[in-house]
UniProtKB/Swiss-Prot annotation:
GO terms for molecular function: IMP cyclohydrolase activity; phosphoribosylaminoimidazolecarboxamide formyltransferase activity. GO terms for cellular component: cytosol. It catalyses: (6R)-10-formyltetrahydrofolate + 5-amino-1-(5-phospho-beta-D-ribosyl)imidazole-4-carboxamide = 5-formamido-1-(5-phospho-D-ribosyl)imidazole-4-carboxamide + (6S)-5,6,7,8-tetrahydrofolate; IMP + H2O = 5-formamido-1-(5-phospho-D-ribosyl)imidazole-4-carboxamide. GO terms for biological process: 'de novo' IMP biosynthetic process. This is Bifunctional purine biosynthesis protein PurH. The IMP cyclohydrolase activity resides in the N-terminal region. It holds the Pfam family MGS. SUPFAM superfamilies: Cytidine deaminase-like, Methylglyoxal synthase-like. It comes from Ectopseudomonas mendocina (strain ymp) (Pseudomonas mendocina). The lineage of its organism: Bacteria, Pseudomonadati, Pseudomonadota, Gammaproteobacteria, Pseudomonadales. Residues 6-151 form the MGS-like domain. Transmembrane segments: none annotated. Pathway: Purine metabolism; IMP biosynthesis via de novo pathway; 5-formamido-1-(5-phospho-D-ribosyl)imidazole-4-carboxamide from 5-amino-1-(5-phospho-D-ribosyl)imidazole-4-carboxamide (10-formyl THF route): step 1/1; Purine metabolism; IMP biosynthesis via de novo pathway; IMP from 5-formamido-1-(5-phospho-D-ribosyl)imidazole-4-carboxamide: step 1/1. Its EC number is 2.1.2.3, 3.5.4.10.
Amino acid sequence: MTDQTTRLPVRRALISVSDKTGILEFARELSALGVEILSTGGTYKLLKDNGVAAVEVADYTGFPEMMDGRVKTLHPKIHGGILGRRALDGAVMDEHGIKPIDLVAVNLYPFEATVAKPDCDLADAIENIDIGGPTMVRSAAKNHKDVAIVVNTGDYAGIVESLKAGGLTYAQRFDLALKAFEHTAAYDGMIANYLGTIDLAADTLSTEGRGAFPRTFNSQFIKAQEMRYGENPHQSAAFYVEAKKGEASVSTAIQLQGKELSFNNVADTDAALECVKSFVKPACVIVKHANPCGVAVVPEDEGGIRKAYDLAYATDTESAFGGIIAFNRELDGETAKAIVERQFVEVIIAPKISAAAREVVAAKANVRLLECGEWSAERAAGWDFKRVNGGLLVQSRDIGMIKAEDLKIVTQRAPSEQEIHDLIFAWKVAKFVKSNAIVYAKNRQTVGVGAGQMSRVNSARIAAIKAEHAGLQVQGAVMASDAFFPFRDGIDNAAKAGITAVIQPGGSMRDAEVIAAADEAGIAMVFTGMRHFRH
């Protein structure tokens, strides 16, 4: 078994980086420790200009850089020095004048940043495919028994500390090698994804339609947490997050207190947070089993999130028990106190948690309190995935939103201004309810939610039952449906319940029949032209 604690010193290092963050300080520390530094191109110039002694690779190999820098380090004196097994290949290395290279610090051409530029063409992308860098990275990672490979700028300080203590252990070199292979895997994946979307006939990158999906799909996720179990206790589980952090989300959130997040906690918290992010004014969303069971929006001058929580909770006090609560404003002490005194809650998440709120929630040690940071009003584009047996469904994120001016009034009666506000509110909520989804809302508060039924009319019936059970007034409320009504019965039931306005996508072959039902009941109805199935 390999000794994991014995430290190996570094006598010679090769440094060639595109991201020069911290490289001067790192090189100075290496030089101060007596390490001979080999370097290339822009990195060599940076070191030389700043007084750090280094040998240019071209001088070391006796072979110049050529082909506009395409060939720099692809030489036996470099790769022999990296790949040479110290216990086996010493004689061969001596015979050919190859000196051992004990540490390689390399990061790669910025391919991702290059192809993200609007004016990037295929030729630009090709020139930013690194060849020498990944070759050195893989060589050093393969020979991690004798060589340390450094691809992350964040590792520099720790490496210097270890070298000052006598060298790097095998365990450290193994970990660095793993990071290196993760790095090159992600890099090659980006290249394959990009080239897989190229339309050769147009010699350009396709950005719409089928051409937006690469021939193979490569994406990298990093394990953030191993969980006690999965959706059910007999299932094992872990939580992986995207390598590149995006907008504020459950994946970027910091847990301030509470028990470890479970598989279901993460899924439900994501549903709650993404729903509350849909609203600009202060809002509260309560989720149970990935469905919103209570949502409310209240302007600051009318009570803000404190009042919004009361209204969201009132929608369905039974389902709120053991739920997830999300806010789109800083959680204050008063609101936190109302929550912990009123109900059992699994998770509370907000962009910011006040000191007063932290103090209040600390009395309930098991409550998971998450701070996710602020987000912009614009939802970021990206991909959603759904695993099926033997495959993966990939689609663009459902970030479609509608405004009042997008609504198509299809009935004789137009909705009032208040009804329009409530219709848009209910529509935003329905987007996050499992299909078939029906949402009853009034004064920007949900009064009944019907979720996950195979029949749309049954979802409408459940929404009415929920409202009655909660003691909430349906008369004068509006109704949102995530998809069109295939028959008029959904409207007939809504009319009996007291619904006065309806928002739905439209598009049924029986739209005329459905519109007629609304007109007969004096209901105002608008079409969005956008469906929000959620499975």
